[in-house]
Amino acid sequence: MEFSAKQIAAFIQGEIIGDENATVHTFAKIEEGMPGAISFLSNPKYTPYIYETQSSIVLVNKDFVPEHEIRATLIKVDNAYESLAKLLNLYEMSKPKKQGIDSLAYIAPSAKIGENVYIGAFAYIGENAVIGDNTQIYPHTFVGDGVKIGNGCLLYSNVNVYHDCRIGNECILHSGAVIGADGFGFAPTPNGYDKIPQIGIVILEDKVDIGANTCVDRATMGATIIHSGAKIDNLVQIAHNDEIGSHTVMAAQVGIAGSAKIGEWCMFGGQVGIAGHITIGDRVNLGAQSGIPSSIKADSVLIGTPPMEPKAYFKAAVVTKNLPDMQKEIRNLRKEVEELKQLLNK
């Protein structure tokens, strides 16, 4: 499909600087631009590329002021990254979607399948499962007994949704995601550990994204809940009875122990670890590799283990980097003190 700058500007409510008849048919990073491509500039680090990019159209923020002549047609918008997302979504929606049920898929007689559903080869749909309209289930995906999946969902190959779990509308589950495996619950005894049956479920509300090889464990009792709009990256572990607030985002390798409550609009960097049975307030930002042993109030910005404010953390990091030199200096000072003591004692 081909679009002109005029059509794109109308769709994203932007201002054209240049040729309104410039056309594009593909997307490209600004540093890899080519004729017929649309790119974007939102990170100032990439500003030098805008003067040499071969892209036909570039989305920029309204406050961008060129320092040199630019070959490309510019479209100025409030938020270039957000506008790019709108265009990419339009591009995705224009692609033809798979439909129909492959003859090699297994669907239990009691399962209920909505309209315009795609179920790929060797997918398994269990007894009393419900699949909503326009949902796509790719090959080799397992949907257990009693599972309910809403409308417009996308489950890529090798997703596993255990029995009785619930998935809302427009959720995306990437390959290898496991929803509803047993929580890590064991009772210590003199002879070892007795397994505690995990009889709860997992609930994913609307527009939740789950990354590849991420696990969301079922509750011991009740439900592990991920609220609407939350986005979870690859290789994340969410334990039994956790509750993740709406629109919270977590980068890869975050680990959350059981019964933690995470607020809305939080942002966790990669490899953050959260202790169990604590509460993280709304809009908390945690830097990568932070270890969180206790509850945190809303609107906090922390990094490190133990967690501290970024300014204090980076000061401590400088001190840590200089520890070998400081140790050497202290040893020399101790040696000098001992020599002075010996002189004074003579």
From Swiss-Prot:
GO CC list: membrane
Function: Catalyzes the N-acylation of UDP-3-O-acylglucosamine using 3-hydroxyacyl-ACP as the acyl donor. Is involved in the biosynthesis of lipid A, a phosphorylated glycolipid that anchors the lipopolysaccharide to the outer membrane of the cell.
Kinase as UniProt keyword: no
One Gene Ontology term from the biological process aspect of the record: lipid A biosynthetic process
Enzyme Commission designation: 2.3.1.191
Catalytic activity, as annotated: a UDP-3-O-[(3R)-3-hydroxyacyl]-alpha-D-glucosamine + a (3R)-hydroxyacyl-[ACP] = a UDP-2-N,3-O-bis[(3R)-3-hydroxyacyl]-alpha-D-glucosamine + holo-[ACP] + H(+)
Protein name: UDP-3-O-acylglucosamine N-acyltransferase
InterPro entries listed in its UniProt record: Hexapep, LpxD, Trimer_LpxA-like_sf, UDP_GlcNAc_AcTrfase_non-rep
Family annotation (Pfam families): Hexapep, Hexapep_2, LpxD
Name of encoding gene: lpxD
Assembly mode: Homotrimer.
Source domain of life: Bacteria
Keywords: Acyltransferase, Lipid A biosynthesis, Lipid biosynthesis, Lipid metabolism, Repeat, Transferase
